[in-house]
Regions:
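His/acidic metal-ligating clusters that form di-metal
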Residues: 35-50, 128-161
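Active-site-proximal beta-strand elements of phosphoester/diester hydrolases
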Residues: 5-18, 112-121, 154-159
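Solvent-exposed loop/turn segments at secondary-structure junctions
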Residues: 14, 56-58, 85-89, 121, ...
């Protein structure tokens, strides 16, 4: 039976480590991640899509990205992600050329267009401030303009840049 709604699971700031005993702010992030996933599996239906919004791997290690991919495979849902300031793009790219995990800048889901915004100009930085580059703003503006001039349905939307 077709549902009349869409379920999105957003995960953010996982700060996981390759070392299972790794701590972030005195919290074992792997244990916390496992508890969150277990709770979701027990109490919610399968999401239609999973979106991870930055700081997946605190250490940026390839093994950490593999661990995340394996853990999320249990949902059988496509995964989209944008990296954070603790992530390491080259290591993520080694692991995530998977069919079900992508770093696309947008995703289409039912009647929804989700635009992922990269506010990270300095991967692996210790800075906590995000910054959206001029090129990223131009990409977002172009994407929004496309849908304003090619709408799936009639809407009123005003953009200020």
């Amino acid at each position: 039976m077709k549902r009349d709604y869409t379920t999105v699971l957003q995960l953010t700031d996982l700060h996981l480590f390759a070392d299972p005993a790794g701590l972030f702010n005195n919290i074992n992030t792997r244990d916390s991640f496992a508890k969150v996933l277990s709770h979701i599996h027990q109490h919610y239906e399968r999401p239609d899509i999973i979106i991870i919004t930055g700081d997946m791997a605190h250490d940026g290690a390839t093994e950490t990205y593999r661990f995340i991919a394996e853990a999320l495979k249990t949902f059988s849902a496509p995964v989209f992600y944008v990296l954070g300031n603790h992530d390491h793009p080259e290591n993520a790219d080694q692991v995530y050329p998977l069919e079900w995990v992508t770093t696309s800048d947008h995703c289409l889901l039912s009647d929804w267009q989700i635009i992922l915004v990269d506010s990270n100009n300095q991967p692996m930085a210790d800075s906590y401030e995000g910054e959206i580059s001029h090129s990223e703003l131009q990409r977002i503006k172009a994407g929004l303009n496309y849908f304003i001039f090619n709408p799936a349905f009639s809407i009123s939307l005003f953009l200020l840049f």
